[in-house]
């Protein structure tokens, strides 16, 4: 997921995507712990996607706070 794609999302879409990614991260952690995870790079991708979404959310909240 690219940052430009994340910036185009609405706040509700961002929240939904964040919840979906957190569930995915949870499942990947269990797969990794039990030795069933074949694509180890997915954990890194999901973690970075979560960080991108949280960064965009934080930037938007900072923008609205500075406008007030």
Swiss-Prot record:
Is this entry keyworded Glycoprotein? no
Q: Does the keyword Ribosomal protein apply?
A: yes
Q: Which GO terms describe its molecular function?
A: structural constituent of ribosome
Cellular component terms (Gene Ontology)? cytosolic large ribosomal subunit
Residue ranges spanning the membrane: these are none
Q: Where in the chain are disulfide-linked cysteines found? A: none
Among Gene3D superfamilies, the record links this protein to: 1.10.287.310
A GO biological process of this protein is: translation
Alphabetical list of Pfam families matching this protein: Ribosomal_L29 (PF00831)
**Which UniProt keywords are present, listed alphabetically?**
Ribonucleoprotein, Ribosomal protein
Chain segments annotated as coiled-coil in the UniProt record:
none
Do you know which InterPro entries this protein is assigned to?
Ribosomal_protein_uL29, Ribosomal_uL29, Ribosomal_uL29_sf
UniProt lists the family membership as follows: Belongs to the universal ribosomal protein uL29 family.
- PANTHER family per UniProt: 60S RIBOSOMAL PROTEIN L35/50S RIBOSOMAL PROTEIN L29 (PTHR10916), LARGE RIBOSOMAL SUBUNIT PROTEIN UL29C (PTHR10916:SF0)
Name assigned to this protein: Large ribosomal subunit protein uL29
Q: Which organism is it from?
A: Parvibaculum lavamentivorans (strain DS-1 / DSM 13023 / NCIMB 13966)
What is the name of the gene encoding this protein? rpmC
